[in-house]
Amino acid sequence: DIGGPTMVRSAAKNYNDVVILSNTKQYEDLTIELNKNKGSTNLKFREKLAEEAFMETAYYESKIFNYFNQKSKNLFPIKNVFSGKLVEKTRYGENPHQKGAIYSQNNKQEIIQISGKQLSYNNYNDLYSALSISKTLPKNKGVAIIKHANPCGVSINPNKIKSFKEALESD
């Protein structure tokens, strides 16, 4: 049986001579490319489409692998595959000279930024540490202050203002 991902991979590996569309969102780009090049496509364009095709098939294969891996309860497979969808590019990575991005395995954006500058990787790391710690506190009764993913101030107090001040003083 040859179909689906096998056909996409076959076309993508022949990008020198083949245009592979793996997503309907690529139709417009193909139309522009064909109009720009009098009915032809250039190699750089075909390479970009091949890369996207391999990304799609790899993502698909990773989902299948993870399904069977979870079903067999294999905690430590010889090889492991992590996949996710881009949530956003961060202001920078762990250090200001690095690039960073946040990916989600469940396709949900779980954090909504209300104001301020774009978050960095470290900001997200601190957020997830704070969420993890706050889950251990009594509901609506505590504050945790986080620096570099480490708790540096914690207070349990039903009065939110007092709890914040106590946590800040314990830093």
Residues covered by each model-derived region:
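General beta-strand structural signal in soluble alpha/beta enzymes
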Residues: 2, 9, 19-23, 42-43, ...
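Secondary-structure junction/capping motif
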Residues: 2-3, 159
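Active-site phosphate/pyrophosphate-handling residues
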Residues: 3-6, 128
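Short, flexible micro-motifs
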Residues: 6-9, 156
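Short, glycine-/small-residue-rich phosphate/pyrophosphate-handling segment
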Residues: 13-29
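Active-site loops and adjacent core secondary-structure elements that bind or stabilize anionic groups
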Residues: 27-33, 37-171
